Amino acid sequence: MGKDYFEADVMAETMRRSKLGSLSQGSRVNLERALSLQTRLGGHIVSGHIDGTGTITRMEREDNAVWVTVTAEPTVLKYIIEKGSITIDGISLTVAYVDDTCFRVSIIPHTAEETTLLTQKAGDTVNLECDMLGKYVERLLHFEQTTEEQTSKIAITSSYLAEHGFL
């Protein structure tokens, strides 16, 4: 680590899921300290684990805000809900609109000034991180369904015992 730089290891998984491989030396990125147990929570919980990428399709100013529209794959969009959280390039934002192909967020002046988001343009790729809660719920429901299916397949009932000569 130096006065104006730091080094970090990057895993192949990060390269596959993110736009990191398309950045060049000197590219600006958004960095934030990790949350500690003493930290006051004042916003969305962001883990830094990228779920995939999206493409900015539109940026338009409205009064003091900028609307940003992003398209993404269904595997990412399924976790995005209106008024829920989405992280774009490490910036935690609230979703204003979502449909089957895209979502929209509104960038307030403070976010515009303190992050790199408005240096992007239509056609640029952005990293996306969805709210973790939706992924946990989906996983839990999958396991509940799988467990029920497995239990019904191997349940020992009186008819099972009779079919196999035990009654």
Identify the meaning behind each predicted range.
Residues 1-167:
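Conserved loop->alpha-helix
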